[in-house]
């Protein structure tokens, strides 16, 4: 049987107090609705319908995918009304899963449980059991434990309020039955809205066995209606990712102070200290050490490398046995070969540091290719930009660049060449040559400092 996923994403999110549609607020640096879409895609459905309303243009700009069919809900008249907009898209003999764009922690495994539980019936509900169910719609069952309906908190009697099995809103239904039930929905209630939950009682009256399944963790089905709940979801997702990494053998010095805002792959015996932030796709090799307060984005870090505190790495490749930082910045296109070292207040962009080479402090390397076992002295600057164009600096194997040197690109420093401290190099330096380009020192005997003129 074919599978369709319908995602409700039309809500304004007034309590967010934001111009941004609620579902575009981010958890782990990704819009909530994008988390939901990714989970839906993991099921490999035949179709995904995204129901939008408030901020539709913003939503379409932020979320892309050829597999998405956009369905507009011009008026927000309840969850049932939202799903009614999908009726023209429904095909016979489909299973239809209904999800919510502000419930980002739902997992593939939970949805598979729901699909499996409802395989032989026309309706399945994802429910959960709570010690404190206040605020949720209760799942009403008869003496045979069959689901007969859902009663909202405000409508429940004392006996129903004692029920601790609650509705999450997530369900799966046969398309033909769903269409029939949706067409029967009424807004004859105080809010004058069409409630999707009303189809449960319809199914029960038809004698349909309503299946149920529950998530492994109640946090999976929590939504965000305000900033506090958004922060709670953020911390819950970070804790989930931290648990997964520790299960795989990663040491997290404090899991409560860990942030992964993308995908992190780690080898064996990796250690991550506090307040490290990982964004995009990051790969850490075996025995990598990440010290406190580092930000690593879309980068690969090789085996036995140490990233010292307060370093920032983006779109970079760091090979085996390297040392980076503290307070180093590797910008896009930076590459370190095996055993290279970049120290404090060193910045690299579109540059490669060869095997065993060092730039230990206070250096800028832009559009630079450094060979093996070269030494870049403190304060070295590659002057790669003339105001219009960028130019390349080449530094050969074994070269030694003295402190406070400026290398004006395009320029090449040969193998085992030496540049004297304080030099401004504008022409090529041949292999094994010494280049000194600085003003001649002049010492003046008997010179006196200026004296203060009193009364002025």
Curated annotation (Swiss-Prot):
Note on cofactor: Binds 1 Mg(2+) ion per subunit.
One GO-annotated biological process of the protein: cell morphogenesis
Active-site annotation: 361 (proton acceptor)
A GO molecular-function annotation: UDP-N-acetylglucosamine diphosphorylase activity
One Gene Ontology cellular component annotation held by this UniProt entry: membrane
Necessary cofactors: Mg(2+)
EC number: 2.7.7.23, 2.3.1.157
Location of the protein in the cell: Cytoplasm
Chief site of localization: cytoplasm
CDD domains: GT2_GlmU_N_bac (cd02540), LbH_GlmU_C (cd03353)
Residues holding acetyl-CoA: 378, 384-385, 403, 421, 438
Pathway entry: Nucleotide-sugar biosynthesis; UDP-N-acetyl-alpha-D-glucosamine biosynthesis; N-acetyl-alpha-D-glucosamine 1-phosphate from alpha-D-glucosamine 6-phosphate (route II): step 2/2; Nucleotide-sugar biosynthesis; UDP-N-acetyl-alpha-D-glucosamine biosynthesis; UDP-N-acetyl-alpha-D-glucosamine from N-acetyl-alpha-D-glucosamine 1-phosphate: step 1/1; Bacterial outer membrane biogenesis; LPS lipid A biosynthesis
Region described as Pyrophosphorylase: spans on this chain: 1-227
Superkingdom, taxonomy of origin: Bacteria
Keyword line: Acyltransferase, Cell shape, Cell wall biogenesis/degradation, Cytoplasm, Magnesium, Metal-binding, Multifunctional enzyme, Nucleotidyltransferase, Peptidoglycan synthesis, Repeat, Transferase
Positions contributing to UDP-N-acetyl-alpha-D-glucosamine binding: 8-11, 22, 73, 78-79, 100-102, 137, 152, 167, 225, 331, 349, 364, 375
Cell wall biogenesis/degradation among keywords: yes
Region described as Linker: spans on this chain: 228-248
Subunit structure as annotated in this protein's UniProt entry: Homotrimer.
Protein family according to the UniProt entry: In the N-terminal section; belongs to the N-acetylglucosamine-1-phosphate uridyltransferase family.
NCBIfam families: glmU
Role summary: Catalyzes the last two sequential reactions in the de novo biosynthetic pathway for UDP-N-acetylglucosamine (UDP-GlcNAc). The C-terminal domain catalyzes the transfer of acetyl group from acetyl coenzyme A to glucosamine-1-phosphate (GlcN-1-P) to produce N-acetylglucosamine-1-phosphate (GlcNAc-1-P), which is converted into UDP-GlcNAc by the transfer of uridine 5-monophosphate (from uridine 5-triphosphate), a reaction catalyzed by the N-terminal domain.
Protein name: Bifunctional protein GlmU
Organism in which the protein naturally occurs: Idiomarina loihiensis (strain ATCC BAA-735 / DSM 15497 / L2-TR)
